[in-house]
């Protein structure tokens, strides 16, 4: 029995400490990596933010008539970091909007998004969601001849999602007229949109809704929804230039807003399209029995920045070049054989070259000629290391990372590790740019989270121990049950002893 109890205890503790990487929940390392990736995007305009999406009809609602199962899959997709959701919607016989191919109403589906937004509406976890709608024709109803029967989709969004969370065309017009937009370095022809930081924290919005075709916007007009002219929504039938092998191709792609590519992806090709500047819309067909296989596709697309199992700060191996160890600084590791790069954690005291970016251009790079520690590169803002008109920097989007790969391929380095402007020196697990003295924007939340993660296993152990003690207190000890019988045995034994002093 003791083995069973302690086995249960060990399982509980391990389940608290560990977690699956990308499905149905994020491991702690994956969560930290995604959060740092979001933070380096803070000054990027929201139309250029790389994200991963799904065709919700195929991924969550296909192969089941169980509404609860489908909505649980949607909740898991939200929790692991999927941000864009393509939804085919249609009218039922009563002209209610439903998810095409299911009996689930659009309002019920939006309620799942609303619950997620409410639970993640804090500095630590907030991120942008994009909803992409397409109204489909069915045999029971028609969008022609009965417009008075159509539901008010603006009212549906307000009731089930919340208008306060939505970024609308009128808000965009105001922000453009007020200058609340992000600069478009390197792509002057790109339309202006606000930065992710302004979107999430200044005006506290969480979602943008688009129609993907003009037929949908004509049938269901709404001041809360952007029309298809704002999108660059491509499918597998559209010829796409990928991979991007030169800066001219990179700049052409960067000028496009809201770049989405819907197709059936494999784990191997989804990263390539992500690095080409497109946000993939996963069109793979899943059902409740196979949905766990989406993990491999998500792993190769959600994180375009960090390598697998990074950021890993736990290795305390001494450096060959210094006796000091502080694994709190990031490098970009370039692999010549496949012309690709990932971020990894390195000892801040190691001597390495550093990455510089031209001021006012997101796609022009340089590498310092001299190697130095991370701290030395940031002394006096790195003066003397970067070329003129360049500053210490890092790739902020997947497309910028691709342009960096193209630049490094011309230098032909073999296994280079180059400092990028990213560190967690100030607060563990809070990765920030602007040098080692930069403060963590959510230091209080991180400290609280670290404290909770530290005491949770202990709390579980204590709870199980208390439970065992309570169980033992309910179970009566056998000698108490047979008290009278044992008393008679003892008295009989004492009476049988010989009296007097032995000779």
From Swiss-Prot:
Cytoplasmic side: 472-503
Location of this chain's protein in the cell: Membrane
Membrane-spanning ranges: 451-471
Ranges in coiled-coil conformation: none
Glycosylation sites: 43, 66, 96, 140, 152, 227, 252, 312, 320, 338, 389
SUPFAM superfamilies listed in its UniProt record: C-type lectin-like
Annotated GO CC locations: membrane
InterPro entries on file: CTDL_fold, Telomere_Capping_Maintenance
Bilayer topology term: Single-pass type I membrane protein
Signal peptide (residue range): 1-19
Extracellular side: 20-450
Alphabetized UniProt keyword annotations: Glycoprotein, Membrane, Signal, Transmembrane, Transmembrane helix
Family to which the UniProt record says this protein belongs: Belongs to the MTC6 family.
Stated role: May be involved in telomere capping.
Name of the protein described by the UniProt record: Maintenance of telomere capping protein 6
